């Protein structure tokens, strides 16, 4: 009797142990499962010509490719209401739009832009250019002044109910007193509650910055990526995502540990913009990281 009981207990214990081992392995495999992008945005400036020619057909095509969110400022001859309604009809969501800091410092212009953004149900108001001029030869005090301007705009955006973010170019990746890059001054001197960062991976790389190091050092500051590649020529010009030298897999893997929420395809200039938009999303959908 005891022998049978012991055998049954042993078998049950062994089975439970096996189930536990398999469950543990499944959890480990799930934890290690590579991630993929399920939602990918597009900045509509990529398709200026196409939008001017046939904005409805272009948006239908963009939605069919699998894009989910749009960053834009123009309505291409339509009212904001009709543009918004058509976007919803084809399954696209408004995400962001913006102005330069010079425009944003004009209170009436900023408030009008925010009102339009809120009507369109955008989440972000973007500062695309933090300088009152060309942005060349900036010193420490210039970066501190820019940070102060950004904080002020961010405060207005907060009051009106929209998140504010700054978009970088290569101009911010110059050494200044006490810092490897002037961009770090903007990160340290802006209030995270008022100012998020939209990290343009092309401009960071072209400027000599390190996207992965930035994500490691400031994991809570970045909320959006602009995704375009650096080509393989000495000029380091724009190219479609996946065509150039940027290691998006490594960057996105690091981004999993940060506040990054949105990945937005952009290409400032392309010979065949629609092809580039298609190739970029195809590459990003197939990327595992």
Model-found features: residue ranges?
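Acidic (Asp/Glu)-rich catalytic clusters
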Residues: 33-35, 59-64, 78-95, 111-122, ...
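Conserved, mostly hydrophobic/aromatic
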Residues: 42, 62, 70, 87, ...
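C-terminal segment of N-terminal export signals and the immediately downstream linker at the start
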Residues: 26-64
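Structural preference for beta-strand elements that scaffold enzyme active sites
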Residues: 39-41, 69, 93-96, 124, ...
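Acidic/histidine-rich catalytic cores of soluble enzymes
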Residues: 157-245
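Active-site acidic/histidine proton-transfer and metal-coordination neighborhood
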Residues: 15-16, 69, 76, 102-197
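N-terminal secretory signal peptides and thylakoid transit peptides that target proteins
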Residues: 1-19, 25
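Acidic-and-aromatic substrate-binding clefts and catalytic sites of carbohydrate-active enzymes
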Residues: 48-53, 71-82, 100-109, 133-137, ...
């Amino acid at each position: 009797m005891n022998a049978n009981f012991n055998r049954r207990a042993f078998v049950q214990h062994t089975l439970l142990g096996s189930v536990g081992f398999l469950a543990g392995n499944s959890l480990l495999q799930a934890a290690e499962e590579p991630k993929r992008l399920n939602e990918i945005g597009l900045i509509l400036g990529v398709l200026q010509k196409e939008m001017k020619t046939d904005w409805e057909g272009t948006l239908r095509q963009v939605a069919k490719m699998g894009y989910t969110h749009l960053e834009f400022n123009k309505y291409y001859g339509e009212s904001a209401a009709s543009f918004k309604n058509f976007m919803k009809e084809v399954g696209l969501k408004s995400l962001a739009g913006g102005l330069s800091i010079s425009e944003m410092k004009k209170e009436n212009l900023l408030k009008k832009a925010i009102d339009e953004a809120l009507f369109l149900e955008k989440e972000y108001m973007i500062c695309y250019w933090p300088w009152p001029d060309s942005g060349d030869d900036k010193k420490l005090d210039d970066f501190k002044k820019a940070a102060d301007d950004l904080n002020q705009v961010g405060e207005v955006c907060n009051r009106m109910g929209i998140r504010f973010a700054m978009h970088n170019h290569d101009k911010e990746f110059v050494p200044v007193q006490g810092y490897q890059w002037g961009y770090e001054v903007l990160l340290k001197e802006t209030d995270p509650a008022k100012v998020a960062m939209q990290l343009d991976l092309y401009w960071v790389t072209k400027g000599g910055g390190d996207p992965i190091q930035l994500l490691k050092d400031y994991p809570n500051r970045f909320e959006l990526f602009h995704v375009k590649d650096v080509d393989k020529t000495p000029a380091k010009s724009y190219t479609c995502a996946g065509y150039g030298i940027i290691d998006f897999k490594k960057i996105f893997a690091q981004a999993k540990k940060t506040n990054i929420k949105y990945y937005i395809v952009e290409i400032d200039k392309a010979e065949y913009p629609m092809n580039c938009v298609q190739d970029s999303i195809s590459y990003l959908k197939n990327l595992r990281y």
